[in-house]
Design a protein with these regions (language model features):
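Conserved core of the sugar-phosphate nucleotidyltransferase
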Residues: 94-165, 169
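Short phosphate-binding loop-to-helix
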Residues: 34, 41-80
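Short internal beta-strands
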Residues: 22-26, 114-115, 307
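A structural motif
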Residues: 16-18, 269
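Active-site acidic Asp-centered loop
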Residues: 87-88
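Left-handed beta-helix
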Residues: 165, 173-336
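Short aromatic/hydrophobic "clamp" motif used to bind/position activated sugar donors
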Residues: 84
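Single conserved hydrophobic/aromatic residue that forms the stacking wall/gate
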Residues: 2-9, 13
Length: 336
């Protein structure tokens, strides 16, 4: 859900990566633990770096941001770093946090919010939008009751840089008066603290619905998006699975798709994102699909605008067709 990254400002010049990361998990986090593991894939399993999974205490997901931070106080206060960087887990971007720390320090800000000027995703019922002056100072914080299509707003998407002591002080005060809404908490802080906003000018996608997830994956077909996200100056690390290279049969035909290793492709694939270990049978036609790992797609199938979760079996001859604004979702381990 949320990533709490913390480090001192002095460390920011040594490296881009944050060396102490806590991931706040929801109630079912087995897949998350399997993916991040010990943190070794992200260079976070060494003596001076750490990755922690922070599950809810009673097995239930936290109901609010304020409650989440309050219940993580033991982890946060145990960290030796002076600053905390909070980031939402549903935001896809590749941002240089060194620049954010430099901005925060230069402005002598108490709180820095990171925002993107764009049309707000439809899944946000009450997004936080900002009125920012030319110097980056936040004049007003709005909680928008609805979303206006095709209009650009300064959307604060949930990334916050703040001193650890200030964060915990405000969270305790909010809990004491039962103020659990982070939007209202930020609004009440505007008169007390110096709040600045840093604009993320790169690619930024927020995933709040199946449609958002589908649109983001389709964006990966665009070279400019891939170049932005997979910037060699800020490489993205992930869990490694040692698979053989993907094999393309004589009957295969692949266009404008991203295909991971370990796949066997014998059919036609166009505008698709296909994860590791996927099998596509002869005569199968896949268009505008997202197929997750270890899925088996039978012969002579016809799939269009379909999102398929892990370990799914699509039997021979099946046809499934969604639409760009309403893709079909097939749950994990289903048999169709």
């Amino acid at each position: 859900r949320d990533v709490l990254g913390s480090r001192g400002l002095g460390d920011v010049y040594k490296r881009q990566g944050i060396s102490n990361v806590g991931i706040v998990a929801k109630s079912n986090f087995q897949s998350l633990m399997d993916h991040v593991g010990s943190g070794s894939a992200y260079d976070l399993s060494k003596r001076r770096s750490n990755l922690s999974i922070l599950p809810p205490y009673d097995g239930k997901a936290f109901s609010s941001f304020v409650e989440t931070i309050y219940n993580m106080h033991g982890y946060i206060e145990h960290c030796r770093e002076e600053y905390v960087l909070i980031s939402q887990g549903n935001v896809i971007t590749n941002i240089d946090y060194t620049d954010v720390f430099d901005f925060h320090s230069k402005k002598k800000a108490d709180i820095t919010l990171i925002y993107k000027n764009h049309a707000i995703p439809q899944g946000y019922d009450r997004p936080i939008t900002l009125d920012v002056d030319d110097d980056g100072k936040v004049n007003q914080i709005f909680v928008k009751p609805g979303v206006v299509d095709k209009e650009a707003f300064n959307h604060a998407y949930g990334s916050i840089l703040i001193k650890k002591d200030l964060l915990m002080s405000e969270i305790r005060n909010a809990i004491s008066v039962n103020q659990l809404d982070v939007k209202r908490l930020l609004q009440s802080s505007l008169g007390k603290y110096s709040i600045y906003a840093y604009e993320n000018k790169g690619y930024c996608a927020t995933i709040s619905s199946i449609n958002d997830y589908f649109e983001f994956n389709m964006d990966l077909m665009k070279k400019e998006v891939r170049d932005e996200l997979f910037n060699p100056q800020r490489p993205i690390y992930t869990k490694v699975r040692d698979d053989a290279p993907s094999r393309y049969g004589l009957t295969s035909n692949v266009k404008n798709s991203i295909i991971a290793q370990g796949c066997v492709i014998n059919g036609e694939v166009e505008n698709c994102v296909i994860s590791k270990g996927v099998y596509v049978g002869e005569g199968a036609k896949l268009s505008n699909c997202i197929v997750m790992q270890d899925t088996k797609i039978g012969c002579n199938t016809n799939l269009n605008y379909v999102i398929i979760d892990k370990d799914v079996t699509i039997k021979d001859g099946r046809s499934l067709m969604g639409y760009d604004s309403y893709p079909i979702y097939i749950a994990k381990k289903s048999v169709v």
